[in-house]
Curated annotation (Swiss-Prot):
Induction: Induced by elevated temperatures via the sigma-32 factor RpoH. Repressed by a SAM riboswitch, which is also effective when transcription is sigma-32-mediated. The gene is metAA. This is Homoserine O-acetyltransferase. It is found in: Cytoplasm. Belongs to the MetA family. GO terms for molecular function: homoserine O-acetyltransferase activity; homoserine O-succinyltransferase activity. The lineage of its organism: Bacteria, Pseudomonadati, Pseudomonadota, Alphaproteobacteria, Hyphomicrobiales. Its EC number is 2.3.1.31. It is an enzyme of class 2 (transferase). Signal peptide: none annotated.
Amino acid sequence: MPIKIPDTLPAFETLVHEGVRVMTETAAIRQDIRPLQIGLLNLMPNKIKTEIQMARLVGASPLQVELSLIRIGGHRAKNTPEEHLLSFYQTWEEVRHRKFDGFIITGAPIELLDYEDVTYWNEMQQIFEWTQTNVHSTLNVCWGAMAAIYHFHGVPKYELKEKAFGVYRHRNLSPSSIYLNGFSDDFQVPVSRWTEVRRADIEKHPELEILMESDEMGVCLAHEKAGNRLYMFNHVEYDSTSLADEYFRDVNSGVPIKLPHDYFPHNDPELAPLNRWRSHAHLFFGNWINEIYQTTPYDPQAIGKLAA
C-alpha cells in the first residue's frame, strides 16, 4: 500500500517521480482499511527536504500510511515558506489530542546548545511525555534521539573536537532484532553531528539495548523495549547529496569544514557521491513500520493504554 499525503505537498511529485507509490486522499477514502497514523515532528530548518526524505522511506512500506506533518508551535522556521507551513503543518498543540501508531522526531541544528537553553525545550519535554500515552512507537533521530535519551534516562551528550561527518562502517550487534531484519553484519551509515552519546552511559541503563555501532563513530542505534522507543543517532534517511549540500554550504559560508569521510569518490568533491546506504535505510524503516503494524491496537484509542 502507498503513503497518503496531501496531493499538493511538494513531496508528492518528487516521490511519484522516484517510483514511490503515493495515494491521493480521494483514493484512500475508497479503501476500507485503517491506515497507520504516522506523525513527523519536523525540527529541521529546511522542512521540505526532510519531509521528502522521511516520506520516501515511510512510503516504501507495503502498508497504507497516513503521514501528518507537525511543527513546534512557537518556533519560526527560517528556510521554509510560511505558506507551506500554514498549508501542510499543524502545531503539536493542535494534534496532542490524537493517537499515533508511529511518531518520528527529527534532528535539529542546535546540538551545541545545552538542552535547557533550547528555546522550545519545555515543549519538547511535554512532547516526550505525551508520546508515552499517545504514541505506540517513537523513532527519535539525531538531536531528537539525544534529547529523548537525555529526557528519559539522563544520558548526556558530549561535544566532539571536530564534526563527525561522512559515511562510516557500522556493525549489526543484534541480528535477531526485529528492527535489523535483513541487515548485513557490516553496513554504511551517513553521520553528521557535533556531539555524541557514549556506550558507557547507555550501558548504565539495562532497559536500553545498543543495536548498531561504529568503531569510529560509536553508538548509532539503541532500542528501549519498555517504552517502545528507538534512538537513531545518525542519518540513514539522508539523500545521496545531503552531505555534499552541507559541505558546500559551509565552504561557501567560510566555515572550516573537512571533506566528509569516505563519501566523494577519490575524495574529489567535483565527483558525484554514490549512495551506499539506501537499501539499509529502506530495510530499517520497513522493519519499523511492519513492527508497528504487527503490534499496534486496531482501535487507536487503545494506544498508550496497553503500556500503562
